[in-house]
Amino acid sequence: DEATSALDPNTTAQILSLLRRINRELGITIVLVTHEMEVVKGIAQRAILLKGGRVSNSGDIVSLFLHPDENMKEFLGEEEVLPASGVNIRLFFPPAVAFDSVITHMARALEINFNIVWGKLERLDKNVVGSLVINVEPAHVARVEEFIKNAGVIYEIVSEDEIKSCAAI
């Protein structure tokens, strides 16, 4: 329980390395309780998110990050400041396409301009996944959706409620 919470980053890395080795060499399942998302990202293959003493999310770590629900987004503490005009599209890049040039290919293929609002790549255990928010003109949304579906990218249109809550920040 909270095995790494009071440790410096180097000691935390050493502890996580030891736990990985124990898991790999001895085949022992390790249950790690932590509030540190970097620890979860660095070692977990599966995770459970508790909220109010109840399981609110569970599954393999990559799926939890590629399909985050409101509880997961809240836990991650990622506030998105989003433009109020245009259409904001949140993209999730699975490991198979995390390093592909999907966005530049899309801009060239569709011959459109759009804004990249924010983005990042994250290492989750042995996988790398990406997330990105783009803002496009309403007239281009259907073409963008078709392109990103065909590219193997998971996406969601950001709701008006999310924009209003972020615009008030």
Tell me what each language-model feature is.
Residues 9-11:
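Helix N-cap at the start of a conserved alpha-helix in ABC-type nucleotide-binding domains
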Residues 58-59:
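ABC ATPase "signature
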Residues 13-26:
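Helical segment within the ABC ATPase nucleotide-binding domain
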